[in-house]
Amino acid sequence: SSAASDVYKRQKEELLEYKRCMEDPLHFIQTYVKIVSLDEGLIPFKMYNFQKEMVGTFHNNRFTICKLPRQSGKSTKMISYLLHYALFNPSVNIAILANKAATARDLLGRLQLAYEHLPKWLQQGVMSWNKGSLELENGSKILASSTSASAVRGGSYNIIFLDEFAYVPSNVAEQFFSSVYPTISSGKTTKVMIVSTPHGMNMFYKIWTDAEEKRNSYIPIEVHWSEVPGRDEKWKKETIANTSEQQFNTEFECEFLGSIDTLISPSTLRRLTYRTPIQSNAGLDIYERPVESNTYLITADVSRGTKNDYSAFIVFDVTSVPYRVVAKFRDNEIKPLLFPQRIHQVAKVYT
């Protein structure tokens, strides 16, 4: 009958389209993903050129770090790609981690909304659906949480998406990478995507600068505010008038310096370069080995050792001006009673 042949024809077309969506995340996102616009409600996700390039980079690389201006649609394209990955890759685990749990859950909520508005033939059966996680019939799971080490420790993940990573406190960011990174690097296809607007010189800054200098495996992606349609010099002047030049430089020019108040002026910090230690072990970084005839000085600062503030000391070579940092130590777990022993061990080497 013609009705039966119509059904067959439709099913065949849907199968071909399903295959195309599976192979081409950009086609899937631009054709089927819906987003909520403040002005127009639910609309198709029309991507900017830089967003298309970013999806290609995510898809073809394992490690990506993105330095993006505010309101550049960064979260939308990320969750669109994660939705594609979960639908077309069975039994994968995906973690959406943000500086606040509420932000991560909001991102998962947007992903769930996009899923609900997909055509039925693109959807999977849903095994569980709540504010903090989603599990599909193909065995793929998505977890939303804050970027604390306990959130994903012990689990194995195929994609870890770190949103606004520069706003995660330094001690949490470092703990996260030391405890979670081994589970990431053990997989051959695991992807890590770090996305943020800069916020001072912290772990995001270090990973970004190392990526630019090709000292790590991350592909750095930078987007200038002028690449977002509708943003021109007039918009820039208006934004600065409504906020401040410093805020604009941080949130839209994506400058690391000046994004938080620092004791040393931004211009001085900008002249300083990051040095790779010749040796690192248990919180101690060594930049230069001791020279017998030289004079050394140690400055120390103690904390409680409760995983918040760091106990730290710096070893300076003060033989001649300018003084040089030759070693540094920092640890937020070492107890105040043990800290002097650690200082003494290093002091003996540099005498």
Outline where the language-model segments fall.
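Conserved Walker A/P-loop ATP-binding site and its immediately adjacent core
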Residues: V92-L111
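Walker A/P-loop
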Residues: N61-Y81
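ASCE P-loop NTPase helicase motor core
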Residues: L113-H117, Q123, Y167-T243, K348
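Nucleic-acid-processing active sites and adjacent nucleic-acid-binding tracks
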Residues: L136, R289-E292, K307, I314-T351
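Inter-Walker segment of RecA-like/P-loop motor cores
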Residues: L108-N158
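Short, small-residue-biased leader/transition segments that mark boundaries at the very start
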Residues: S1-Y8
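Conserved pre-motif I regulatory segment
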Residues: K12-K67
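ATPase catalytic-site recognition across NTP-hydrolyzing enzymes
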Residues: Q175, E227-V302
